[in-house]
């Protein structure tokens, strides 16, 4: 396994892809690690037959620039990893069949802790506030801090963030449409 500089949450990857900055991101932080739970979250975009499948396509196109962190990589610490996740209420730690809220963040944090990776990248501000005091040796970095590093200047950073916000709105709208369709289907049956 290459020397991993940081562990990346799915939302950071999605944001980088939205503004076509994934290569800059991977180059800035090489080598990036993705917890297998985050990997499974990103792979779900493969089945999207819509304009957001590029998130998965970019992930595959750049697979030589990152490592997937598997629980088996933890060796003797795997039991502790699973125990920590169970204390947070996670019993299913695969996350390939459904979206388990915050599993990716916690799995990333515990991988960083057990593998002694000093940085975790996350957009979840509540998670960051809750966990940063608990594990002070791990620095949690937000998208805005990352974007500042990989942008040419403030105008470029603002442009990237504007694109990301627009794409997030589109994704949320699509999710609401899907949820509404599911609800209507269930009500009919």
Kindly give the residue locations of the regions a language model identified.
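Short acidic/polar active-site loop segments enriched in Thr and Asp
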Residues: 118
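Short, ordered loop/turn segments at secondary-structure junctions
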Residues: 125
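Active-site-proximal, substrate-binding regions of enzyme catalytic domains
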Residues: 2-115, 128-189
